[in-house]
Amino acid sequence: QSLRALIPYLEYKKDRSWRKKIESNVRDWWKLVEERAMESADPLNPERVFLELSKRLPETAILTADAGTTANWYGRIVKMKPGVMGSLSGGLATMGAAVPYAIAAKFAHPSRIPICCTGDGAMQMNGLNELITVAKYWKRWSDPRIIFLVLNNRDLNQVTWEMRIEQGNPKLEVTQNIPDFPYARYADSIGLMGIRVDRPEDVGRAWDEALAANRPVVFEAYTSGDVPTLPPHISFEQAKEFSSALLKGDPDEVGVIKQAVKSMAAGILPHKDE
């Protein structure tokens, strides 16, 4: 009501150059997002997982995103349609929030489809146990669909990248590596549906299957931790620290350099439609 009351006091500006510039920048940004997501990675680019979700996002979805790289991809890539609700980990720092957030959303709105976006670190912290709660209650829901996307990159990836960019330190494997775990098979074992994807050409079809499922789904995306979570433009200081980390002998140096070059090229090289 307050905004509507202000409308009569607004003056139309004939000079639309600033608006056109913003619109052009937004179009360029979404082109860049898609091009980066379509770049290959070993075994799978996490950006592709979120891009394919964004294309299929139902209006009844409730998205929850955990602390970590899932919050980065959620914030950059997913286009929120009218009606879609979303929630991030409080303060963007509390690991393990996305799974219980999604479960709570399902109890509050049983006819909607919560989609939890979490990493393997948070899933191992408390998410696996929370799935037992889902297994107990899902048959009581009017719509049984709830999806738990797990980025399985075997790494506490957000902190790994923060160490490289903010401190110039290489990845410390003893603190950053986490055990590989069969999330999809675990889901199957407790009566849920498990879907595991490690090839880009299978991602879209896997989302279609998850969104049409007749029970809760654990969507395990076996992704690369080498894809940089950096924005398209970084400061000189960040670039210096990144280079320093690699010079000190990062164990994932080859993959990190390869993916960083691909991401930068997507922002520098001409677009396919230009």
What are these language model-derived features?
Residues 80-85, 162-171, 238-240:
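Short glycine/proline- and charge-enriched loop/turn segments
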Residues 1-2, 9-12, 162-209:
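Conserved thiamine diphosphate
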Residues 53, 65, 104, 120, ...:
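Hydrophobic, well-ordered secondary-structure elements that form the walls
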Residues 1-22, 137, 141, 163, ...:
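Glycine-rich, acidic loop regions that bind phosphate or pyrophosphate groups
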Residues 209-274:
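Glycine/aspartate-rich loop-and-adjacent alpha/beta segment that forms the canonical ThDP
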Residues 67-69, 152-155, 222-227:
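Glycine-rich beta-alpha junction loops
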Residues 72-156:
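Thiamine diphosphate
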Residues 25-109:
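Active-site diphosphate/adenylate-binding microenvironment
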